């Protein structure tokens, strides 16, 4: 079964949303500064990006520097995400640019999946032995409500999305665990993340856009084959305020000597010497 992301704190039931305090909305410039700090703290390989959903296509097209994918061609969403995070493109995506009534379009709320998907016929004999398993995969996949005309993607450093609905970045497992440590630094909460399997974009931007919660995913075969995601890369998606919280936490961890890259102490060395520095005065 595909589990949904839940963030837990204390004895709160695991299916409750995490408690959030009201904070002023961060503008594009402030988020760009956070992205630069994140890059410095985690030494990311590619640009952190933002995503913003639009009910009005004209409003999306008014985003500064927006470009549209070539007419007459369709791409997977993960391909367009990679164009943004690697080449720095600000892209506007509609149903003209991704396969319509597919997982790509329905995960980001541009339409609903077609019968060939929901029935299980599409993935039967490919990703799943039988139609029932393929249909269950589709039924449990996180998706945004299908009421949007477009999605804009842009590097956070450009400050063109004011402000994005969610922020995303790719990184290796060491970078991801430090980011989570940063989220937990001041106000602890426990995280659980979902694994849909194939169509893992539903666990990252799909889940984050739908719930506005921190979402960590293991990119799937298609994201790696078509989107060019590297073998060691994972994907983090979160609202801007969680990015701010994590950066603050990473700065606090850095002051305690907990930084990226993580310096190996050595598997055959006595750990007491290293721990004595991290936990000085704690005995």
What are these regions (language model features)?
Residues 1-5, 10-35:
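Cys/His-rich short segments
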């Amino acid at each position: 079964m595909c589990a949904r992301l839940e963030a837990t704190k204390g004895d709160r039931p695991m299916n409750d949303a995490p408690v959030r305090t009201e904070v002023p909305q961060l503008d594009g410039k402030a988020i760009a500064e956070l992205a630069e700090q994140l890059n410095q703290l985690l030494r990311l390989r590619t640009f952190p990006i933002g995503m913003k959903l639009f009910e009005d296509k004209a409003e999306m097209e008014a985003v500064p520097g927006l470009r549209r994918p070539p007419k007459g061609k369709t791409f997977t969403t993960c391909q367009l995400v990679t164009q943004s995070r690697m080449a720095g493109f600000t892209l506007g995506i509609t149903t003209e640019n991704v396969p319509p009534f597919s997982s790509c379009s329905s995960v980001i709320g541009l339409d609903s999946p077609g019968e060939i998907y929901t029935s299980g016929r599409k993935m039967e004999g490919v990703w799943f032995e039988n139609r029932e398993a393929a249909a269950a995969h589709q039924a449990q996949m996180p998706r945004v409500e299908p009421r949007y005309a477009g999605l804009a993607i842009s590097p956070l450093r450009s400050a063109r999305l004011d402000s994005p609905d969610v922020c995303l970045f790719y990184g290796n497992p060491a970078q991801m665990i430090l980011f989570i440590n940063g989220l937990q630094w001041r106000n602890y909460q426990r995280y659980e993340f979902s694994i849909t399997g194939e169509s893992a974009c539903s666990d990252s931007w799909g889940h984050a856009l739908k719930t506005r919660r921190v979402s960590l995913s293991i990119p799937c075969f298609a994201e790696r084959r078509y989107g060019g995601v590297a073998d060691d890369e994972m994907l983090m998606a979160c609202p801007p305020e969680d990015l701010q919280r994590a950066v603050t936490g990473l700065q606090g961890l850095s002051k305690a000597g907990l930084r990226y890259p993580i310096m190996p102490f050595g598997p055959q060395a006595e750990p007491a010497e290293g721990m004595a520095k991290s936990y000085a005065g704690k005995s």
